[in-house]
């Protein structure tokens, strides 16, 4: 073989090796996890994101963007061709006459006993859905809460369906080493720490919105956003899925709206006057489709920025703005307090099964500006 032939052959061999290696690291069977270093990602600009490959202590598979996009297109076509599930197919409000099960705008309030799990599971299994879950753990919240949250979520959150956990931390070196079950994967993002816990709470709206635009909208069908200082106790399943999902706050679900701790100062964008309001919603859990969650986070952050401009801070920070949002944009589904319960209240007869419970609030240990 002449010199020219050997050169061409060498180039072909090298190209083949590169292609094979690239396909391996991007395949579901690859043994790596992509961890993002994203100090301040700009909306729609992935060039600000930086990352490294890490061994998969965390996970037994990785997410493949090209393959998933192809699957997503097929799923969308199948969903269009499938028969839409009607509320009456799976929801029976008469099963729980002891509680409010339907809102004035005809949205279901999901309590244990009101839904047919078998019908829902069968429907969503055919849809081949992917559900995302965002959680923030900054500072000492990582060591105090993150591991237990993730272990319990791995066990109880959307079991049997594909799940992506989006974990936002300010120090990836403190990320607990957890092995996930089948159909589950992690994406870990390093975010900029804030000086005050109040700012961490409010900035999460901005960060979630940025990540939805950058990639989440292409990766999941539904998205939940949750606080880290809580623990899954039982199945948190597909009965919770909807276009726009709000969570009833455990301490206020029986109270009159005028008793709610809404923001009552007119100067705040979160202002809700006495005489108005439906329920008091808990910012520890909210969700919906990526498009709806994006709208929630953008509108809440817009209100936060308006308050900063007017030198005011809503009483309950992002939660106050979330309640204002849901007053103006009614949620299509509401979760009962069973899905986010505080055992300090006790266990009244209407709470049949606790799905998620609050962790003990150790603010003196985890908040750095008290």
From Swiss-Prot:
Q: How does it sit in the membrane?
A: Single-pass type II membrane protein
Q: Which GO terms describe its molecular function?
A: glycosyltransferase activity; metal ion binding; N-acetyllactosaminide 3-alpha-galactosyltransferase activity
A Pfam family this chain is assigned to: Glyco_transf_6
| Record pathway | Protein modification; protein glycosylation
Q: What is this protein called?
A: N-acetyllactosaminide alpha-1,3-galactosyltransferase
PANTHER family hit by this protein = GLYCOSYLTRANSFERASE-RELATED, N-ACETYLLACTOSAMINIDE ALPHA-1,3-GALACTOSYLTRANSFERASE
Q: Give the Cytoplasmic compartment stretches of this protein.
A: 1-6
Localization, per the record, is: Golgi apparatus, Golgi stack membrane
For this chain, the family text in UniProt reads: Belongs to the glycosyltransferase 6 family.
Q: Which CDD domains match?
A: Glyco_transf_6
Entry binding sites for substrate: 136-141, 227-229, 249-252, 261, 361-367
* Required cofactor names: Mn(2+)
Give the species this sequence originates from.
Felis catus
Keywords of this entry? Glycoprotein, Glycosyltransferase, Golgi apparatus, Manganese, Membrane, Metal-binding, Signal-anchor, Transferase, Transmembrane, Transmembrane helix
Q: Which GO terms describe its cellular component?
A: Golgi apparatus; Golgi cisterna; Golgi cisterna membrane; vesicle
Q: Give the highest taxon in the source lineage.
A: Eukaryota
Residues that bind Mn(2+): 227, 229
What does UniProt list as catalytic? 319
């Amino acid at each position: 073989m002449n010199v020219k032939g050997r050169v061409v052959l060498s180039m072909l061999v090298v190209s083949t090796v590169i292609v094979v290696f690239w396909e391996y690291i991007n395949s579901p069977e690859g043994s790596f996890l992509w961890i993002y270093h994203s100090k301040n990602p700009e909306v729609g600009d992935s060039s600000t994101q930086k990352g490294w490959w890490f061994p998969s202590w965390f996970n037994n598979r990785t997410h493949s963007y090209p393959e998933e996009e192809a699957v997503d297109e097929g799923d969308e076509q199948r969903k269009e061709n499938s028969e839409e599930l009607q509320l009456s197919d799976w929801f029976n409000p008469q099963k729980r006459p002891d509680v409010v099960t339907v809102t004035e705008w005809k949205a279901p309030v999901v309590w244990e006993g009101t839904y047919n799990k078998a019908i829902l599971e069968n429907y969503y299994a055919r849809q081949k859905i992917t559900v995302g879950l965002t959680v923030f753990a900054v500072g000492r919240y990582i060591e105090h809460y993150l591991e237990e949250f993730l272990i319990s979520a791995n066990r109880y959150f959307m079991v049997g369906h594909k799940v992506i956990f989006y974990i936002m931390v300010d120090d990836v070196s403190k990320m607990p080493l957890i092995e996930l079950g089948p159909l589950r994967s992690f994406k870990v993002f390093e975010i900029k720490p804030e000086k005050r816990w109040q700012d961490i709470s409010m900035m999460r709206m901005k960060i979630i919105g940025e990540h939805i635009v950058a990639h989440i909208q292409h990766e999941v069908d539904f998205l939940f956003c949750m606080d880290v200082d809580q623990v899954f106790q039982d199945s948190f399943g597909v009965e919770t899925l909807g276009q726009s999902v709000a969570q009833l706050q455990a301490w206020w679900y029986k109270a009159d709206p005028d008793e709610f701790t809404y923001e009552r100062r007119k100067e705040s964008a979160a202002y809700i006057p006495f005489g108005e309001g439906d329920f008091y919603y808990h910012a520890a859990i909210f969700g919906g489709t990526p498009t709806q969650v994006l709208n929630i986070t953008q509108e809440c952050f817009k209100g936060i920025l308006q308050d900063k401009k007017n030198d005011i801070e809503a009483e309950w920070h992002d939660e106050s703005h979330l309640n204002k949002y849901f007053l103006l944009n009614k949620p299509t589904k509401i979760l009962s307090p069973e899905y986010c319960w505080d055992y300090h209240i006790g266990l009244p007869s209407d709470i049949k099964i606790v799905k998620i419970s609050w962790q003990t609030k150790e603010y003196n240990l985890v908040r750095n500006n008290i």
